[in-house]
Regions:
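AAA+ P-loop NTPase catalytic core and its hallmark functional loops
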Residues: 1-196
Length: 196
């Protein structure tokens, strides 16, 4: 059974899609985020992570903890739910969060070689863009890293009213930003999905 703080955090995420948890060290922020992550992945037991419900003749019937709980979670109709986590620190980089070029150190080649990295926000966004996908991005210690540098153009695009529509369509308010496409290597315009 989820705690009241967890339910409140999920309700806020369903409404605004962004929640900032703050407090003094040792007050239970990490524990709350772990509980929120589990509740998000399982949708309070209504939508098991990893696919549609499976018949289990020995299992119980999943019942929401309270009336209306289904709508009080982010992306209640999405079944492919995944949590992505990252921790910000002094050396956090844009390339680790969105995309960028890094040296390929394990390749045997005549000269230097580079690879394009898919960052945490990019991977979460691509998962949420899937037909049945929803992603929860947990950024721990956001105040310890250079957040503006790490987010880059996504700092505005992460606002809930600046994202794509729930069907992936562009809206008048959708905020696009340029980034290096990890697949093609080209600079592309990118927007964040509704179910992130």
């Amino acid at each position: 059974m989820a705690s009241e703080d967890c339910k409140q955090a999920l309700k806020l995420l369903a409404r605004s899609r962004n929640v900032l948890v703050s407090g003094a060290p040792g007050t239970g922020k990490s524990k709350l985020l772990a509980e929120v992550a589990l509740a998000f992945e399982t949708a309070f037991g209504l939508a098991p992570a990893g696919g549609p419900p499976q018949l289990n003749p020995m299992g119980g019937i999943p019942i929401p903890p309270a009336a209306g709980a289904v709508k009080d979670i982010p992306a209640p109709t999405k079944m492919d739910r995944k949590v992505f986590r990252t921790v910000f620190h002094q050396n956090s980089k844009y390339r680790d969060f969105l995309s960028g070029i890094t040296p390929a150190v394990n390749k045997v080649a005549a000269g230097p070689d580079f690879t394009i990295v898919k960052g945490t926000l990019y991977r979460a966004s691509e998962h949420a863009k899937g037909a049945n996908g929803a992603a929860l991005l947990i950024i721990d210690e956001i105040n310890r890293g250079p957040a503006v540098q790490v987010f880059g153009g996504a700092i505005v695009a992460i606002e809930s009213d600046k994202r794509l529509a729930s069907d992936g369509a562009k809206l008048a308010e959708t905020q696009f930003f340029e980034m290096l496409d990890p697949v093609s290597g080209d600079v592309i315009e990118y927007a964040l999905p509704h179910d992130l």
